[in-house]
Each structure stands twice: as C-alpha cells, then as structure tokens.
Regions:
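Charge-rich, well-structured scaffold segments of protease-associated domains
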Residues: 1-58, 62, 79-87, 92-97, ...
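Edge strands and adjacent loops of beta-rich recognition modules
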Residues: 71-78
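Intrinsically disordered, low-complexity regulatory segments
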Residues: 64-69
Length: 237
C-alpha cells in the first residue's frame, strides 16, 4: 500500500517497470520513418537489455452477482433525502469486441442520451430520479458498462429498480425503433469520422486508441479501423 511504500521499494519498482521492456512506442505524422527508427535504436533502445518477462493478460472470471450498499459524502448544507443512487454493472466483452462497444454506445444514447430517451423519460416523468446514464468503459482488457440512476428518495428505490428492469424487458421483447437506432448510429459515425477531439492533439488521441488493443496483444490499428464495423451495424442495427 502507498502509505507503507519505502523509497527503496519505489526505486525498485521504477527500475523494473519504467523500462523499454515494458514500453510501447508509436510515431505520428509525416516523419522520415527509417531515420527516426534508427535514431531511437541507436540512442535509446540498443543500449538496454530486456529485463521484464512478458506476461499474458489476466481476465476477471465471472463472479456471483451481489448487492452492495456503500455510503458516500455530501455537503453539510445538502439535503440527503433524495441523494440515493442505484447502479448496475456488467462486463461486455474484451478489447477485441470493438463492434460491441460501438453498439453499446448507440444503446446508451437511445436509453439515456437526453430527457426524451426511454429510461430518462419514464423516470423523470414520474419524478423518481433526476439523472440516468449508461457509461461504456472501453479501452481496457475487459470492457464494461454501468447503468446509474441518481437523486432517488429511499422509499422509491424498489420502484425505480422495477421500472428500470420492466422497461428493459419491454425493449427486449418489442425491440427499439429502427429509425431511432439508424439516426443514432449515423450521428456516432459522423463524430468518429470528423475526428473532433475537443482541442486535444490528434496524434495523442490516436496513440490512446492504438493502445486500447495493442496493450493486450491485439493489432495496433484495430481501434482505428471502424468503417466495416459501421457497415455491419447498419445492416443489422
């Protein structure tokens, strides 16, 4: 644990893991590739020996579903009456399931994207919650999602859970409006193709996307190539 970490342990950890053996190098832009690679090799990589064994990824095995109650802090002046939250999480595949990640991002927008989205609308109209969102956590060995509903009163917790699961079951049985799915899919595709990263350098974002697969043994370019994924999803949204 950090409070018990000694300086010697810190140095040992640094020397073991902050090493080219545990590094991923990527280049971005129109650079003289041969010259840059030669420079990296001569000035940096060739003088060091590999000292870190390559370990395969460790997957989280399925666990028994459990209910956990956790306290969290609020401000002294805040009213705790409607500060309850409910959340459900689930693994949705591995780093290789990029098509599933994009499909889940579409589903997140359909379910919780705005106040007229399916789950938002039913809970807001009944005054049972203030926020509903479905977070998709990708770029990891195992991607996962979390559906969260917040600003709930304690006496409404069971009702909120019932409405959430009933609504999802109805969608499973009746399906989601195809036009809505296609519109959301088109919007997401446009955003990705425009490569608008909100002011962040494009090369840095590309590097992060490369690592989302490369870190776990996948192809570096896997999460940069999504044209076919959208084509497949359009055929069967």
């Amino acid at each position: 644990a950090i409070p018990d970490l000694t300086y010697e342990q810190f140095i040992q950890t640094y020397q073991k893991y902050y090493h080219p053996s545990n590094a991923f190098v990527f280049l971005d832009g129109d650079v003289p590739l041969d010259d840059v690679l030669e420079l990296l090799n001569q000035e940096y990589l060739s003088s060091m020996e590999a000292n870190l064994p390559i370990e395969g990824p460790i997957y989280q095995q399925p666990v028994q579903v459990s209910r956990q109650v956790v306290d969290y802090e609020i401000g002294e002046e805040e009213n705790a009456e409607n500060k309850y939250r409910m959340a459900w999480g689930n693994v949705i595949g591995s780093y290789q399931d990029y098509e599933k990640v994009i499909a889940m991002q579409v589903l997140s927008d359909v379910l919780c994207g705005d106040n007229q989205a399916v789950l938002n609308k039913v809970l807001l109209e009944k005054g049972l919650a203030e926020n509903v969102y479905l977070a998709i956590n990708d770029g990891e060995l195992q991607n996962w999602c979390q559906l969260e509903v917040d600003h709930i009163k304690e006496e409404n917790l069971d009702q909120v859970k019932e409405i959430v699961f009933d609504t999802l079951q109805t969608l499973i049985k009746k399906g989601i409006d195809r036009q809505q799915l296609e519109a959301t899919l088109a919007y997401l595709e446009l955003n990705l193709k425009e490569r608008n990263f909100g002011g962040y350098p494009q090369g840095i974002i590309f590097g992060f996307q490369v690592l989302e697969s490369w870190l776990y043994g996948g192809k570096p370019e896997a999460h940069l190539e999504y044209g076919k994924i959208f084509d497949d999803l359009k055929k069967n949204p």
